[in-house]
């Protein structure tokens, strides 16, 4: 049996852009040929694509690092470097992608073929042909390629099912799924026979169809991790209707009503929204002795908890083993699904700010200035650091261009206001230079 994995932590890194080239046209009969260095190619992006054929996150168990290729360097004759191909990473339907640092949801991938650029490749550096001006017709300036985005991610798979079967172990969930669909879950006369979610397609006699999931049995304390705990409670979150399966024969020696209350408490503790979903009570094993009497007692206790009869959940007595009462249950489930909307899985507070995450939002500050214990002024900030890494520090003209960019951003003036003096050390990343006033 293939292993089921529904969570994974991975890192993704997009490719770096290729460096621009400094080159000059030197041909016979072409005086003053001018700059001829081309741009670097763009780095490859990391793209997640949904594949309906995948059922688990098992592929990410041993392969946790995904790195796209970098773009090629620019060439002479003004030719651009080749851009790198994007790296496509396939994920199953129902995969939620979170930022590992903040826990915020980046995207919920639910449609087959759906794609998202999860880490954008760096743009290629410009060659010196781009920097020619009337004042400087032969520039010795070219940019380094921009680094690709790098992210730490958490993947969480929540299977796509319209209906979820919940209940204590050995109440007959797997048997029910096996007789109403073509699914073949493992069935046994012991607890936790089902240790992975099973999914089956159900078709009613009236022609309606829906996906039903058999989830591993819950026990008291599951929401705190007891038994299989929260490992599989997450799979209930996408369902629109819950079928609460109860062993009405009390063959395990437990009271059916106490089972019902206990499981609902676990659902509510795990996620308050789960109790917003409509729930049908499936009174299973009605072909067993004591089941009828237990059902009467169950209904009496249940009614005592409701003020109005209309509020009572629907109860369907069935026997999965004897194939009794199944048609009525499935028809009622289909009708309930037809009038039940999708439930929002996440609040806005759970989601990343897309503009900020993907770099579209304008920040108030382009840079920050701090001072180390050794009296070195430290410059930081996303825009400033990006300009720095794209500057070729081996060429004087590139360094002078970077200095002009810093002045244009107001860095020099800000350093003076903070008290920087001529000759003070200034650091950007690992590069250190002296402040010139």
UniProtKB/Swiss-Prot annotation:
It comes from the Bacteria. Pfam families: DUF1967, GTP1_OBG, MMR_HSR1. This is GTPase Obg. The keyword Cell inner membrane does not apply. PANTHER family: DEVELOPMENTALLY REGULATED GTP-BINDING PROTEIN-RELATED (PTHR11702), MITOCHONDRIAL RIBOSOME-ASSOCIATED GTPASE 2 (PTHR11702:SF31). GO terms for molecular function: GTP binding; GTPase activity; magnesium ion binding. Its EC number is 3.6.5.-. Belongs to the TRAFAC class OBG-HflX-like GTPase superfamily. OBG GTPase family. GO terms for biological process: ribosome biogenesis. Residues 359-437 form the OCT domain. An essential GTPase which binds GTP, GDP and possibly (p)ppGpp with moderate affinity, with high nucleotide exchange rates and a fairly low GTP hydrolysis rate. Plays a role in control of the cell cycle, stress response, ribosome biogenesis and in those bacteria that undergo differentiation, in morphogenesis control. Residues 2-160 form the Obg domain. It comes from Streptococcus pyogenes serotype M2 (strain MGAS10270). Its cofactor is Mg(2+). Disulfide bonds: none annotated. Residues 161-338 form the OBG-type G domain. GO terms for cellular component: cytoplasm. Monomer.
